């Protein structure tokens, strides 16, 4: 499905995952997708407990979550609190930087923002573009077209492709309407 095949409007309640705790994985020098195994911190779990009290979430029909641990742990608490069904989508993962290391990630983020989500031909770091991210999200969400309101628990860079917010805090809720 391309971006030219859109048609169904869906209310999406984006939720950024709770604060993660990377300490154990960093101590063991995990990188790449290995770092995505990080669970929520205690503060992150408290953030989700507060989030779960939001009656707005119950207006949705389903929760769709990234398969990344910090998002999935967030989604599991929200699903328990709301009673909403939970689906896990591996394609709702974090923005991809195709090189390892926190320095390379930060450089890629800077270049992504400076270049409005585009990857310049001479870029010193390779990363997923805004168009690629948006396409990945829309293709993934197409299977939920029968739902009018969906909670999507995902990651800041992915959410930013659909909302104007510069800063998206842990467990922040942002509602928008998206054509799927």
Predicted regions and their residues:
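Residues at the C-termini of beta-strands that transition into short coil/loop
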Residues: 16, 90-92, 177-180
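A short acidic-Thr-Gly-centered motif at the start of a beta-strand
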Residues: 2-6, 142-145
